Amino acid sequence: MASQKQMEVVTKGTGFRRRPKTITYTPGTCELLRVMMKESKLTNIQQRHIMDIMKRGDALPLQCSPTSSQRVLPSKQIASPIYLPPILAARPHLRPANMCQANGAYSREQFKPQATRDLEKEKQRLQNIFATGKDMEERKRKAPPARQKAPAPELDRFEELVKEIQERKEFLADMEALGQGKQYRGIILAEISQKLREMEDIDHRRSEELRKGLATT
């Protein structure tokens, strides 16, 4: 009667917990697992974990949990690409000198003097000036026309000297253009220097006259 009550209590209660069934691994199986662990390149910690499971007689895990050193780290955020400014176009290669010469890059345009006046006539004019000290052409230009009522005002000597110096400069430039500047350069420069001294004398004399005129007033 007592045993029957005891059976009823067991059946009505939670009952006994069943202990999981232990597995006995043969030495051959253990050796095979060791070889497989080496081939799988498991760490020492993972190998010891599996060996402990085998010693306890538990079922082998389907996946071996990685160690802390092998845990997958959170993927780093991919940095956004940096856009650099566009590179300037490369400088073109320099052409060799012989190619430049062939294309005429080094050729210079030859100077061609352009005579604006009759050089022979100008030379004759200057020779007359050197010989007589007078400019016949200038006198011809200054001659008043026959029908002119009032005579043209006579040019001031200072202005005449300025004009004569300018004419000699132009003549020397024309001779330089013809390659004959060396022949006339000394004479022309001497004439210009003489006329400059005469202009200085005129200027000095005018200054004295102006000073005297201001003193008398």
UniProtKB/Swiss-Prot annotation:
Pfam families (alphabetical): UPF0193
Alphabetical list of InterPro entries matching this protein: UPF0193 (IPR007914)
Source superkingdom: Eukaryota
Protein name, per record: UPF0193 protein EVG1
Protein's gene: C22orf23
Family, as annotated: Belongs to the UPF0193 (EVG1) family.
Species of origin: Homo sapiens
